[in-house]
Amino acid sequence: MKQNPAKTARMWIIICLLFVLGQATDNDRDFKMCGKWLHGIAPQNLEYDLKTGCERIEISANESTLSIQGRITAKCTQSSSIQLDSNPHQNQSHFCVFWEPLLDLLIVEVNGKNHTLCKPNGLQGTCCTDLSQGVQDNAHMYGIVNGSVKGDIITGDLKGNYIFDGAHINCKEKFCDEARLKPRGANMIEEVVMRFNAKGRVDLPCAQGTVIEMDEEFTGHNFTVPAPRFVDANTIPSVYIPSSLRSVSRRKSKVVCTYYKNKTLFERGPSKSALLDDIVGLSVENETIRNLIEPVKIRFHHRPFAPDSSGRCVSWDTKQDNEVNWKDDGCDTVKINEEQTECHCNHLTYFAILVQVEQKSTVRHLKALTFITAVGCAVSLVSCLVLFYWLCKRRRGKKNQISLVHRGLVVAIFLLCLFFILTGILANVANETVCQLTGSLLHYGLLSTLCWMAMEVFHTFLLVRKVFNSPLPIWIFYLMGFGFPFLLVSILLSVGDIYGERKIKPSDDVNNPYRMCWMTEGDKSQLAHYIINIGLLAVVVSSGLVMLFLVVREIRNRPDWKKIHVAFLSIWGLTCLYGTTWALGFLDFGPFSEVTLFLFCIINSLQGFFLMLRYYALERMKKKDVSSSDGSSSGSSKQHMLQTNEKS
C-alpha cells in the first residue's frame, strides 16, 4: 500500500510540534491546572493544606469539597477551609490552580473568583517547579473532568484526583533566562518586581530592583539604585523621584526601580551609537506616567567621553515600541562634569546614556562665533535705529522712493538681529510654544532681509536700465519685502513640526550644546531649509553679483574711480546693499572653512553698521559737493559711485 507523501509530511510536522510543545510545558516555570468539578447541590468548600518542601501537589474533588494539598512551597505554610459561593441549581464549577514558584504564590480560581492560598513572599532562589504528571484515580459520579495543564487536555474522563510531582530548580536564574529570550523581557522583570509583596531591595541574576511606597505625605525621594555586590558603589546611578509622581486619587502607590548592569536586554542592531552599561527602569503600579510637571532625575556615572563623542539621555517606551527603540523625546541631558551626566525626563520608562560619534554635526569655536555674532547684531541694532531716523529725517516732506526702499531693508535687518539675540535666551527659559513662535519670527526676519536685498537689486536695475517710464508703486516693493516672507512662514507654520528648539554642539564640549529657537532637525525642516533658505539665498547672491558687476562696469571710467578709497567704498557699500556678502555661506569647506565662517559671522552680523557707514559717507560727500565753490563734478561723481541709484 502506497503512502501519501503529503500526509506523511503533515504527520512529521505534527509530531515535531507536539515534541516542542511538550518540552516547553515540561520546562516551564509556572504551573496552571484547570478542570471542571462535578459536585452535588449541597454547599461546597475549598480545603487546602500546604507545607514547605518539594515533593508533590495533589488536586482532588468529591461531592462537596475541592482539595489542594502538598509540599511545594518555599516559605508558605497554610491549612484551612474556605466556603465557596454555591448555586443549588448548578452541579458543576470551573476551577484553575495557579502556581508561581518564583513568588511562592498559589491561587485557586473557582467560577471566576480568586482565592489566594499563598501570598507573594519575596523572590525565591531555589523553588519547586517542573511539576510532572503523576497518577490519577478514577471516579464514578463526583470529581474532575476535562483536566488540563496550560490548556492541554490531560484526559476527558472523570477523575477523583490529579497528582503532580515537583523538582528543585534555581528559579531566579531560569526566570532571567526566559526574560532574555523575550522581545520585551525587561517588562517581565519589572512586573515580577512590582508584584514583590514588600518594600525594599529585590535581587535577580539579571537585574536589581527596589520598591518604594508613596503615601499621602510623600514629598519626593532621593536614592541610589540597588546594584550587584561586585560593582563599585561610587559608580551606581542615583535617582530623584518628585512629589508630582504621586497620584492624588490614590492613597498609596508603589514605584519600582530596576537596574541593569548588563545591557543585553536592551541592545539593538548595528549602529554608530552605543549604550553605556547602566540601564535604569522606573514605573508606577498600574499607571502610565507622562508629562510630569517636575522631571525625574537619573544621574549616571561614566568614563569621560572621547573628544568627538557625546552622550545623550535616551529612553525606550516598551508599551509603545515592541522592538528596542531609543529616543531622546521628553528627556534633557545635563552635564554635571566629565564623569557624570544627569537625565531630566518627564515620563517613566527605561533610561540610559547613548554615546554617539558626532564629528560632522559639531561646530568648532562655537562660543567665539556666537559671541561675535551677538555683539555684531547688537551693534547693527543700534545702527539700524540711527539709520532709520536719518532716512526719515532727510526725506521728511517728500516721499522719495529710494529712501522708502532703504527703510524696508533697514527694518528687515533690525528684525533679524533682534530675534537672533532673543532666540538664544528664550530657548533656555521659554516653553515649547514660545520657542516655536520665536523660531518662526527669526526665520521671517531672515527671509525679509533677503527679499529686501533682492528688492534693492531690482530697484537698481530699474533705474540703471530705465525699464519703465514711471517708477513702480512702492507698495509692490513692500509686498515682496514683507508680505512674501510672511506667506512662506505662515505656510510652514500650518505644516507643523518645522520650528522649535535647535541644539548646536561645539566640537570641544558636545555635551553642552548651544540652544536656539530655529528650524528643527526633522526631515520636513531640512527640506524647507534647502528649498526656501538656500534657494532664496542663491537667487539674491547671484543677482547681487550680476548687478554689482554691471554698476562697477558703468562707473569704473569716471575720474575719481582711480582713487583707491573711493573705489573700495563704492564696491563695499554696494556689496552690503545687494547681499553678496552672504555668498560666504557657500564657501564653508576646505582648509579655509574656519576663516570663511568667522568672516561670514563678522560681516553679516555687522551689516546694519556697514549700511549706516555707507549712508554717512554719502552725506559727507554731498556736503563737500555743495560747499565746492567751483561747482565741479568731483563730489557728485564720488557720490554716484557709492550710490548709483540715489538722487539727492
UniProtKB/Swiss-Prot annotation:
Residues 1-24 form the signal peptide. Autoproteolytically cleaved into 2 fragments; the large extracellular N-terminal fragment (ADGRG1 NT) and the membrane-bound C-terminal fragment (ADGRG1 CT) predominantly remain associated and non-covalently linked. Residues 349-361 are annotated as: Stachel. The chain crosses the membrane at residues 371-391, 409-429, 444-464, 472-492, 531-551, 564-586, 596-618. It is found in: Cell membrane. Residues 313-361 are annotated as: GPS. Belongs to the G-protein coupled receptor 2 family. LN-TM7 subfamily. This is Adhesion G-protein coupled receptor G1. It comes from Danio rerio (Zebrafish). The gene is adgrg1.
